[in-house]
Structures are given as C-alpha cells and as structure tokens.
C-alpha cells in the first residue's frame, strides 16, 4: 500500500530542481500547462486571494516550483517582499512566495505561496 506522506516540502531555492509526485490518495492541484503536481489540498489556506491576473489560492507549501529573486511590491494588502514562483517542469510563472510582510497584520503570509487559479487544475480524488 503506498504511503500518503510525501515527506517535507522542498525549500524554494532558485538553483535547484525538485521533481515530486504527490500520492494518489490526496486531492491535489497540478499545473494546467504540464500537469506537474503543485500542492495537496490539505495545504490550502485560503481561496480568497487576488493574483496579478485574477483569483488565486494561498498555500502553506508547494512542490515542483522554483523561485525568482525577492523584490518589494505594493500589493492590495500593503508592502511585501515577494519572489515569483514558476513551474519547474514547464517554467510558467504561477504566482509568488511571500518572503516578508511589513505590516503586523500580514505576517501570517510569510513563507506562504500564491498560485493563480488560471495556472492550476484539480487532480486525484475530487469525485
């Protein structure tokens, strides 16, 4: 019987490539462009976020993504230091990682990931 524990999520480093497959027993989200696994549904924090190009989900952890350099951006909720994230398989920009929030009320986002809905699809066990 396959294990449902894929282990810890890899660190988001721009110099390494990670190739992870999430167990079929988990509902997952995948890249709509290449179907690389991106996140388990269990890692979803909120569906109420806005990305650069539409609605987005906030995740606690993701797999198979790379990070660009961090930069400061003024977002709807204030100034943040963020790094764009991209699919390691097809290199499509998916959203961003919150590196630092400058307002106390936004600190919960630090280390979390935004993936835009237009770049992901539901996979495994959603029936």
Swiss-Prot record:
BP GO terms, sorted: negative regulation of erythrocyte clearance; negative regulation of erythrocyte differentiation; protein localization to plasma membrane; regulation of cell shape
One GO CC term on file: nucleolus
Quote the InterPro entries the UniProt record gives. Yippee (IPR034751), Yippee/Mis18/Cereblon (IPR004910), Yippee_fam (IPR039058)
Q: Which PANTHER family match?
A: PROTEIN YIPPEE-LIKE CG15309-RELATED (PTHR13848)
Q: Does the keyword Metal-binding apply?
A: yes
What protein family is recorded? Belongs to the yippee family.
Give the protein name, as stated in the record: Protein yippee-like 4
Chain sites annotated for binding Zn(2+) = 31, 34, 87, 90
Q: Looking at the record's lineage, which domain of life comes first? A: Eukaryota
Every Yippee domain range: 27-124
Q: What is the lineage of its organism?
A: Eukaryota, Metazoa, Chordata, Craniata, Vertebrata
* Record carries keyword Nucleus: yes
Give all Phosphotyrosine modified positions: 98
Tell me the tissue specificity: Detected in brain, spleen and testis.
- Residue ranges of the TM segments: none
Entry's localization field: Nucleus, Nucleolus
A Pfam family that this protein carries is: Yippee-Mis18
In its UniProt record, a GO molecular function of this protein is: metal ion binding
Post-translational modification Phosphothreonine, affected residues: 92-93
Major localization listed first in the record, in broad terms: nucleus
Keyword annotations? Metal-binding, Nucleus, Phosphoprotein, Zinc
């Amino acid at each position: 019987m396959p294990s449902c524990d894929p282990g810890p999520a890899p660190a988001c480093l721009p110099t390494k490539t990670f190739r992870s497959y999430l167990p079929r027993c988990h509902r997952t989200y995948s890249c709509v462009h290449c179907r690389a696994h991106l996140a388990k549904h269990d890692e979803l924090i909120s569906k109420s976020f806005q990305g650069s190009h539409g609605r987005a989900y906030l995740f606690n952890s993701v797999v198979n993504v790379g990070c660009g350099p961090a930069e400061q951006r003024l977002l709807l909720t204030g100034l943040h230091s963020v790094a764009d994230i991209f699919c390691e398989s097809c290199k499509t920009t998916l959203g961003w990682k919150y590196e630092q929030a400058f307002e106390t009320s936004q600190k919960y986002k630090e280390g979390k990931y935004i993936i835009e809905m237009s770049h992901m699809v539901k996979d495994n066990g959603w029936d």
